């Protein structure tokens, strides 16, 4: 894998630096590096394709080396270099496409395609010019079963959920109490609602508890807690739990109340947040949100009309908050919202009409992967995203 990365890195640097008018001595290092690459690859035959609609092709490498000059690079020199660049870029893309449609239930982080397996032989070790990227370091650590560290902005750690929990409801659902929740990507939105606005609760305080769990723990977490939950703060017709009828969720946001967010790791309480704003948590794999809705001692007639004593109720008082994970580190590879690598893999597998594999669901959906994230999926995803990043260098 590191050999393919080094080839792509060399091609990428050659493409950027070898331009008409450049002084040769300024690019001599990348020229010599390319020539060493060509000498190593020449005489080798590689095979790509054959899965799905990917065409089969044999690559018999026999490339000319780039010469030296005492002058600036002219158009003829650059054109010769472009021919080498185009050939190697096409070769890299074909290898990456072939690799991205393969998966293995065991040792999924190791190369699976014939070409990548061949490039792992000792003959090509001299090509290993550059393996300093974080992607290569993480892949190398994962393949040795060490603990790599991945850094993510807005990490996609929450499974998609858009539902509710009813704690109380009459036959017509005019008097309802419960939790409305929406989670996706890096966001968890909660609305604790009560049609009576805690009218009959002890001390006029109604308590709500929401439990959440991540499929993988995250660490060094920077998060934001803010009032409001825009995705659940709207009138919505919801089905009842038995799907026999529907009821109107018509929230009115209230400010009276308190909350506590407890963060746990392996069942042990790690940290606690009670205030809005920016917060940090060392590590967690589950969390519990406790909301206490407090009925105000006095209300204007307009507010009382929304929540009349004894009903009927056309609205629900809702205490809302949003938890957003801004930055975090993890020991597991995730779909990165700031990178196109995941979409490159998904699109390649779909465009190639890849047959259903043994590791991922057809279509490579992240939500289904995250909901049942296995070790085999993690290993394969590590390899696939690294290959996608290599392809991206020469696209």
UniProtKB/Swiss-Prot annotation:
Q: Matching Gene3D superfamilies, A to Z?
A: 2.60.120.170, Viral capsid alpha domain (1.10.1350.10)
One of the GO BP terms on file:
fusion of virus membrane with host plasma membrane
**Alphabetical keyword list:** Capsid protein, Intermediate capsid protein, Virion
Species: Rotavirus C (isolate RVC/Cow/Japan/Shintoku/1991/G2P[3])
| Subunit text | Homotrimer. Interacts with the inner capsid protein VP2. Interacts with the outer capsid glycoprotein VP7.
Q: Which family does it belong to?
A: Belongs to the rotavirus VP6 family.
Q: Which GO terms describe its cellular component?
A: viral envelope; viral intermediate capsid
**How is this protein named in the record?**
Intermediate capsid protein VP6
InterPro entries annotated for this entry?
A: Capsid_hemagglutn (IPR008980), Rotavirus_A/C_VP6 (IPR001385), Virus_capsid_a-hlx_vir (IPR008935)
Annotated GO molecular function terms are: host cell surface receptor binding; structural molecule activity
Name the source's superkingdom. Answer: Viruses
Keyword Translocase assigned: no
